[in-house]
Amino acid sequence: MTVVLVHGNPETDAIWGPLVDALGRDDVVRLSPPGFGAPLPDNFPATYLAYRDWLEGELEKIGDPIDLVGHDAGGCHVVNAMMHRPELVHTWATDAIGIFVPAYVWHDLICKPICQGAG
């Protein structure tokens, strides 16, 4: 079973270092969303659908049963992908489920693209 970790904004996959060390496993994959710890391709539209499709594509490449974990904006991508393609994983968890509460307040670094309708 592969563990896949998706970090948020403005982090890099280094945020998962202590957890990966504690797990003591060699089947952990740390994914960095385009533009957040990974290069942003010129033609990548950076919309919530584009990030969903990116994550689904990465999960398809792994192929093994997957336990998926998302944090912050990475957790938003996890929820979006799992609502669309739940069969891609064995289990999933996120700390970002609160984004579905109408009164949720986005932090400043993620609010710019989302709150202005760009993402």
Spans of features found by a protein language model:
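Structural signature of beta-strand start/N-cap positions in the alpha/beta core
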Residues: 2, 27, 64-67, 88-91
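Active-site signature of alpha/beta-hydrolase-fold catalytic machinery across serine-
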Residues: 18, 80-84
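Conserved HGGG/HGGXW glycine-rich cap/lid loop of the alpha/beta-hydrolase fold
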Residues: 1-39
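Flexible "cap/lid" loop of the alpha/beta hydrolase fold
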Residues: 83, 90-119
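Active-site loop/oxyanion-hole signature of alpha/beta-hydrolase fold enzymes
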Residues: 30-69, 100-102, 110
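Gly/Ala-rich beta-loop-alpha elbow adjacent to hydrolase catalytic centers
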Residues: 70, 74, 78
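Conserved G/P- and acidic residue-centered "switch" motifs that form tight phosphate/ATP-binding loops
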Residues: 35, 74, 91
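Short, flexible active-site-adjacent loop segments at beta-strand->alpha-helix junctions, enriched
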Residues: 9-10, 72, 98-99
